């Protein structure tokens, strides 16, 4: 049945009175209530709200992906204008018809790329599949287009990446592959669910610009779901604020940022960390927590002086980690990914050392190598005077009680067959630390400390939002009272209010128990708030390391300055053409087997502040 008369000429999408619910214990639990909005051709609508507010399930309902997950969707109207200009009612489409709509007319970039990419197919095959299905292209034509899309999202060595699998890529690389896949068929509507959450600030800036360029070329409507108000200020035309499944405020981006009316909107904006807010301060500070009832009332931030003098709890010297790449008829190793090259640093009890850098710079690999989750080819890792890199498997397991890891992708690191209570109890059982009754009480306490309810222990991972799942992973890491926590993008999936609570929790635990954090992140505003020291990594090497004050207030290396310049600012009226971005000609850390790359030489430029010498800045700094 034609619906052209029901959709305004300029609109590509219109939704009226959307209601979403889930059945739990034979009760209907409402997730979204009476939500209405429209999207114009070439417009970007940002949907913002806390984790669990209903943002992602709204997107899944539009894609008709909720029914198979047990969602109950009711809507008075859900109209889409296809690329052919035909208007269809999405709720009336059969499963077969929706397969032709998804990808071609409406595409989605999902929040967790590791679980969205098929692990048994190469990256090239997955991108080409959509192109072949919707554009009637041959396999060869589809692969050429797939490479072009990878080039557009600035993946270096795109031809090589086509033949690799998702587990061989970093989190940011996987997210860029997802973006390339979604944009490959030039849809009429693009739904982006936290598309830049896993990306560092420089690549995030490139992706936001890329989406805007393609949007202008194709007059594509974009629904941008995010908790990053800096990104909202940069990309949105209109903003829809959702609180507990209901729309509480909508307006242009200027209206929302400059004259917010609802207390929840004001609270969201007040909770946004601002880069530069720590200028002149020596120690980490708690985030001010803003309540909905009193958005202007702030908890006084307390400086955290926690570093213990003496011997480092963790010492890393000349760490080298490489991954083999096979090719040829005999499948021999011909090249290697130089993921980490001669990295050295110390970590003291009660200290937070942040590793920052682009996706693929070696941050996550460094963290994993410290626990021997990936094997290194050289260097020393010393924990409390004991070399980790030479331990037997039995002794290594005992040591892992004192070093815990919070992984980047929360859904992939939780067992879907276990309740979250069992997942949190598991490390306690493995190490035989607490009897069952005490363990259950410990789980309840941990869940409350990370902002969840004790009764959530009986639920499964798929019943939680991405941010809630990350809080579960943090609770599990804290269960054993470790001496060191390696946090790999631990708060990147959290909205601003919960992020502040989690950072404050980490700071409190650091103050109470002297925990040392290796904090891996691309969020420079959060890094500035939580760090004692900062190390900047590029192509597997540290190019600048020093105190937070030194690195943020007096950055010496060109790459550090570029990272800071790329941070989005929560001010829509600010013009950003002057922002410095990396060259499109990204260098590669893939080299022929046996080829050695010169290690950078760090020069002291201030107390505890070391920077790569100019002559050591080899091809990775394209000026």
Swiss-Prot record:
Residues involved in ATP binding: 49-56, 357-364
EC annotation from Swiss-Prot or TrEMBL: 7.4.2.10
Start and end residues of each ABC transporter domain: 15-269, 314-564
Membrane topology of the entry: Peripheral membrane protein
Enzyme class: translocase
A single GO BP: transmembrane transport
Localization (cell): Cell inner membrane
Keywords (A to Z) from UniProt: ATP-binding, Cell inner membrane, Cell membrane, Hydrolase, Membrane, Nucleotide-binding, Repeat, Translocase, Transport
Keyword Transport recorded: yes
Catalytic activity: glutathione(out) + ATP + H2O = glutathione(in) + ADP + phosphate + H(+)
GO MF assignments: ATP binding; ATP hydrolysis activity
GO cellular component: plasma membrane
Main subcellular location: membrane
Family according to the record: Belongs to the ABC transporter superfamily. Glutathione importer (TC 3.A.1.5.11) family.
Main function: Part of the ABC transporter complex GsiABCD involved in glutathione import. Responsible for energy coupling to the transport system.
Self-association state and partner proteins as the record states: The complex is composed of two ATP-binding proteins (GsiA), two transmembrane proteins (GsiC and GsiD) and a solute-binding protein (GsiB).
NCBIfam families in alphabetical order: PRK10261.1, PRK10419.1, PRK11308.1
Protein name (database record): Glutathione import ATP-binding protein GsiA
